[in-house]
Amino acid sequence: MWRYGLDMASLDWIGNGDHDNGGNREFSWWLVQKTTSLFTVPGAFEPMFTYERSVSYPSGHRNAMFAYRGVRPLPRIPGSQEKLFGTPEAGSPDIKTFYAYLKHFDGICASHTSGTLPASGNVCHCVP
């Protein structure tokens, strides 16, 4: 992937986007971190430290992105459906925790599969 982004596509950045950097397996996370650093060409190609955080309906998928190495994927909140997904009125505790984590580590995210129906008003899943 890195060689494609650097050579064939002539991109200036790319991110791995693996689901939780290999499902919280130590070697998978380390390998993504290491290869992201390895293929950096300052001023020409800046791979970003990214992963996809996939939570099923209604919370959806988000691609997390960080400018620096070493941020581990955020685990899901254990417990009931309500703890993970919340309610339409109160929002999702899991997503609120995720946005606090992004803020703490200076990260950003893109919601690419909201996991909600268009009429559900998933704007509530965004950072205010």
Locate each region found by the language model.
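Extended, charged catalytic domains and RNA/DNA-binding interfaces, predominantly
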Residues: 1-128
